[in-house]
Amino acid sequence: MMRMSWMVTVINRRMMKILIALALIAYIASVWGTYANMRSIQEHGEMKIEQRIDEAVGPLREKIRELELSFTQKYPPVKFLSEKDRKRILITGGAGFVGSHLTDKLMMDGHEVTVVDNFFTGRKRNVEHWIGHENFELINHDVVEPLYIEVDQIYHLASPASPPNYMYNPIKTLKTNTIGTLNMLGLAKRVGARLLLASTSEVYGDPEVHPQNEDYWGHVNPIGPRACYDEGKRVAETMCYAYMKQEGVEVRVARIFNTFGSRMHMNDGRVVSNFILQALQGEALTVYGSGSQTRAFQYVSDLVNGLVSLMNSNISSPVNLGNPEEHTILEFAQLIKSLVASRSHIQFLPEAQDDPQRRRPDIRKAKLLLGWEPVVPLEEGLNKTIQYFSRELEHQANNQYIPKPKAARMKKGRPRHN
C-alpha cells in the first residue's frame, strides 16, 4: 500500500511538472508577443530589447530543459526507501569533487538530496545526470548567505580545498569556513538536523606527531600562506562543538586526508592531478623540495563511504578518514610515470613554504567505532583517475566542454604537495 502511495505521489509530481512547463511556455509566448508589439511601435533599440528578452527567457529555457530531462533522461538505479527511512539531505559544495560523489551515493541509496553550490570550484556537469529526478534539487547559492530549507541531515563540504583556489581568495575562503559554517549550524539548530563538517588533515599543520591521531592539537602557522584554509577549518570545528554544547545541535566532524579520483579539476594544484596531467602531456613532473615528504592517498569512493558511516553513527568527536599507507612524493611521482608509461622526467623545484613534511592518519578510531577503512588499492584508484583525466583532455581537445573550466589564479606562493 505504501509503495502504491509513493507511485501516486510521483505521478502527481510529474503532472505538476507538465502544468509548470505549459505555464512557462505560455509566459514565454506572452513575452515574445510583447516584444513583437514593441518592435511595431519602436524602430530603434531593437538589439537592446532583444537582449533584455533573452535575459528574461534564458532561465525559463533552462527550466524547461530540466523538465524535459525529467521525462527523457535515464538515471542511475535508485533504491526504493519508505517515507520512514528516506531522509531529506542537504549537501553544501555538492557539485564539487567529493560532494558530487557523495550526491551519487545518497541518491542511489534512495534519499532526497538537495545540492547547494556557488560553482566557484564545483561544476554543474558533475551532477547533471540527476537533474530532473524526483529526489534531486540543485540550488545555486553561496553558504555565506543564510539558507532556509527543511532537511534531516546536512553534509557541509562547501570550501575551496586546493592551494591555488584557497590562496587565490583567502578572505573568501575564511568567510566560507566561518560564516558559511555558522549559517549551516544555524540551519541545523532551526530544523533539528544533524550536521557533518568536512574538516581536514590540515588542522594538524606540519605535524610533530606521526602518525596523526584525533587527540593531536596540531602545529599550524596562523599567518602563513595556507592559514586561511587551515585556521578556517579549525574555527569551523570549534563552532560545531560550541553549538553542540550550547544549543544541542548534533554534529559530526570528519578530518579528511588526501583524496583523489574522477571529477578532480585537472588544474587544482594538488599532487595527484599535477603528476597525472604532466605525465599524460609529456611534461616534467614537478617535485617541490627533495621529494622525501610523505603523504597517504585514499580513493574518493572510500572517503564517501566513511562520510556516510560517520553521519549515521553516534560518534560526535572528530574522526580521521584517510589511508594509512604512506608514500614519499618522489615514489608517488615515479609510480604515476610508470602507470601512464610516460617518458617525462622529474624536475625538482624549491620547497614550498610551510609544506608538511610527513602526513599519515591514525585511523584506529574509524576502524573500531565505524568499522571503516579504505579498500581500494592505490594503483587501482590511480588507473581509474588516469583514465578520467585522459578523457578530459580528449574532450577539451574536441571542444566538448564549453566554456572550459578556468584555472584558478594564485596571488602568492606555489602549489604544494596536498
Swiss-Prot record:
Skewed-composition ranges (Basic residues): 406-418
Residues that bind UDP-alpha-D-glucuronate: L147, Y148, K175, N183, G186, K189, R190, Y243, Q246, E247
Gene Ontology CC terms: cytoplasm; Golgi cisterna membrane
Glycosylation sites: N314, N383
Signal sequence, start to end: none
The keyword Lyase appears for this protein: yes
Keyword Membrane: yes
Protein's recorded name: UDP-glucuronic acid decarboxylase 1
Taxonomic path: Eukaryota, Metazoa, Chordata, Craniata, Vertebrata
Gene that produces this protein: uxs1
